[in-house]
């Protein structure tokens, strides 16, 4: 697999009211993509600017306006055929952002979810394979409601809710921005400018009222 990622590192800034941080890194962007697509010939990316029209469309589907002005979607190909997509993103936990990666099929179905960086002092039980496997087979049509579509991990309710919100966003981003775009296949296999392995903390996204922090 040809994979060349130009990435930097950064330490996310904590909120003033945050609890003591216990940051543990499990994957870099490079390593998670290599594990997601071990047999792919090429892994590239495309960064999508979120203009007013796209933001409104995403907000309608998500139930909240996305916080970022652009999103990067990675794509794996072999002989020009799409093997799958990946989204590396952050979702706010109780005090700190959780960095995670979602692998999706060529049709936008969730195949795997991995925690890349966990920064909370507790709640990392969301790394348990039994919790993460609940997302397999889900698509943008699944609401991923906590304790209805996805069972929360005992003692990690907020982190469970955060991952459900983040994975659902990944399915919608891929469907709205990437599916069917042949130009993705020719994107260079290099990390987008400003992408960071440790994924600096990002502005807190508006969240659906039904999600309990």
Describe each region flagged by the PLM.
Residues 14-161, 165-213:
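Flexible, solvent-exposed loop/hinge segments and secondary-structure transition points
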Residues 9-13:
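Predominantly cytoplasmic-facing regulatory/coupling regions of multi-pass membrane proteins
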Residues 1-8:
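Bacterial N-terminal signal peptides
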């Amino acid at each position: 697999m040809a994979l060349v990622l130009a990435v930097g590192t950064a330490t996310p800034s904590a909120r003033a009211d945050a609890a003591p941080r216990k940051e543990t890194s499990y994957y870099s962007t490079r390593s998670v993509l290599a594990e997601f697509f071990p047999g792919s010939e090429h892994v590239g990316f495309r960064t999508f600017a979120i203009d007013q029209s796209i933001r409104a469309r995403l907000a309608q589907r998500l139930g909240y306006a996305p916080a970022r002005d652009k999103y990067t979607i990675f794509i794996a190909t072999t002989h020009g055929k799409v093997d799958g997509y990946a989204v590396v993103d952050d979702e706010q936990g109780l005090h700190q952002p959780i960095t995670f990666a979602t692998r999706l099929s060529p049709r936008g179905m969730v195949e795997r979810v991995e925690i890349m960086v966990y920064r909370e002092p507790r709640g990392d039980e969301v790394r348990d394979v039994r919790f993460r496997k609940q997302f397999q087979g889900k698509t943008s049509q699944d609401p991923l409601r906590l304790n209805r579509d996805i069972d929360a991990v005992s003692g990690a309710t907020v982190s469970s809710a955060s991952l459900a919100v983040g994975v659902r966003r990944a399915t919608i981003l891929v469907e709205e921005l990437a599916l069917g775009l042949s130009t993705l296949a020719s994107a260079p296999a290099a990390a987008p400018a400003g992408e960071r392995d440790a994924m600096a903390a990002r502005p807190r996204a508006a969240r659906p009222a039904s999600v309990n922090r």
